[in-house]
Amino acid sequence: MTLRCLEPSGNGGEGTRSQWGTAGSAEEPSPQAARLAKALRELGQTGWYWGSMTVNEAKEKLKEAPEGTFLIRDSSHSDYLLTISVKTSAGPTNLRIEYQDGKFRLDSIICVKSKLKQFDSVVHLIDYYVQMCKDKRTGPEAPRNGTVHLYLTKPLYTSAPSLQHLCRLTINKCTGAIWGLPLPTRLKDYLEEYKFQV
C-alpha cells in the first residue's frame, strides 16, 4: 500500500480521510490516486463513515446496537486506511480494510487473502457483503467451535440521512435501470452518482 499522511494528525496515529494521499506528483494525480479519491468521495456520501475514531469510541457507539450494525472509521493501524467496526453476537469487533493496487478487500490471513473478492471502492465492498449476508442469513445460528459469525446488515449513521439519499437508496434497491426511468436527466445523474443499496 502506498499511502502516507500528508500532515500530522496530532494523535500519534493516522490522519483523517482528508489527510491521506498517495505518493507521487502533487500537480497531476496518478490514475490510482484518482480512483482512491473517487472511492473516498463515495464513502463520504454514505452517512456511515465516521472518520477519526478510536477503537473504544467505536465499541461505545455499537454497544447497544443490534447484531450486524456496522460503521466505517479511519484505521488506527498505520498500514491501513479504514476499518469496519461491527456488532457481533460476542460484542463489537473490528476488521481492517486493505487497499492495494487500486483495490479494496477485507484483511485476512495470508492463505485466504487471494480468495477474497476485491473492489474498486469501499462502498462497493460493503454493499457486496451486506447483500451476501442478507442472502445467507435465514435465522440465528449457533456458533461452532467458539467462532463468531460476522454479519453486516445495517449501517450506523453519523446523523439522519437526507430524504434525497434515502430515496436514492430505495430506487437503487428497486431497479438498476436508472436511465429507463421517466425522470429528468439531472435527477438521473444524481442517482448515477451513488449506485449502491446501502
From Swiss-Prot:
Q: Where is the SOCS box domain?
A: 151-197
Disordered, as annotated region: 1-29
Q: Tell me the Gene3D superfamilies matching this sequence.
A: SH2 domain (3.30.505.10), SOCS box (1.10.750.20)
Query: Which GO CC annotations does the UniProt entry carry?
Result: Cul5-RING ubiquitin ligase complex; cytoplasm; cytosol
The SH2 domain covers which part of the protein? 48-156
Q: What induces it?
A: By a subset of cytokines, including EPO/erythropoietin and CSF2/GM-CSF.
Q: How is the protein modified post-translationally, according to the record?
A: Ubiquitinated; mediated by AREL1 and leading to its subsequent proteasomal degradation. Ubiquitination is dependent on its phosphorylation at Ser-52, by PKC. Ubiquitination is stimulated by LPS.
Describe what happens upon changing residue 106 to V. Does not affect ability to bind phosphorylated substrates
Stored InterPro entries: SH2, SH2_dom_sf, SOCS2_SH2, SOCS2_SOCS_box, SOCS_box, SOCS_box-like_dom_sf
Q: Which CDD domains match?
A: SH2_SOCS2 (cd10383), SOCS_SOCS2 (cd03736)
Please give the pathway this protein is involved in: Protein modification; protein ubiquitination
Query: Which residues are reported to carry the modification Phosphoserine?
Result: 30, 52
- Region Interaction with AREL1, annotated ranges: 1-75
Q: Where in the cell is it found?
A: Cytoplasm
Cross-link Glycyl lysine isopeptide (Lys-Gly) (interchain with G-Cter in ubiquitin) maps to 173
Biological process terms from the Gene Ontology for this record are: cell surface receptor signaling pathway via JAK-STAT; cellular response to hormone stimulus; cytokine-mediated signaling pathway; growth hormone receptor signaling pathway; intracellular signal transduction; lactation; mammary gland alveolus development; negative regulation of apoptotic process
What are the entry keywords? Cytoplasm, Growth regulation, Isopeptide bond, Phosphoprotein, SH2 domain, Signal transduction inhibitor, Ubl conjugation, Ubl conjugation pathway
Q: What is the effect of changing residue 94 to D?
A: Decreased ability to bind phosphorylated substrates
- Per the record, what about its domains? The SOCS box domain mediates the interaction with the Elongin BC complex, an adapter module in different E3 ubiquitin ligase complexes.
Could you describe the subunit structure of this protein? Substrate-recognition component of the ECS(SOCS2) complex, composed of SOCS2, CUL5, ELOB, ELOC and RNF7/RBX2. Interacts with IGF1R. Interacts with DCUN1D1.
**According to its UniProt entry, what is the function of this protein?**
Substrate-recognition component of a cullin-5-RING E3 ubiquitin-protein ligase complex (ECS complex, also named CRL5 complex), which mediates the ubiquitination and subsequent proteasomal degradation of target proteins, such as EPOR and GHR. Specifically recognizes and binds phosphorylated proteins via its SH2 domain, promoting their ubiquitination. The ECS(SOCS2) complex acts as a key regulator of growth hormone receptor (GHR) levels by mediating ubiquitination and degradation of GHR, following GHR phosphorylation by JAK2.
Q: Which PANTHER family match?
A: PHOSPHATIDYLINOSITOL 3-KINASE REGULATORY SUBUNIT (PTHR10155), SUPPRESSOR OF CYTOKINE SIGNALING 2 (PTHR10155:SF7)
For this entry, the protein name equals Suppressor of cytokine signaling 2
Which organism is this protein's natural source?
Homo sapiens
Read off the lineage from the record: Eukaryota, Metazoa, Chordata, Craniata, Vertebrata
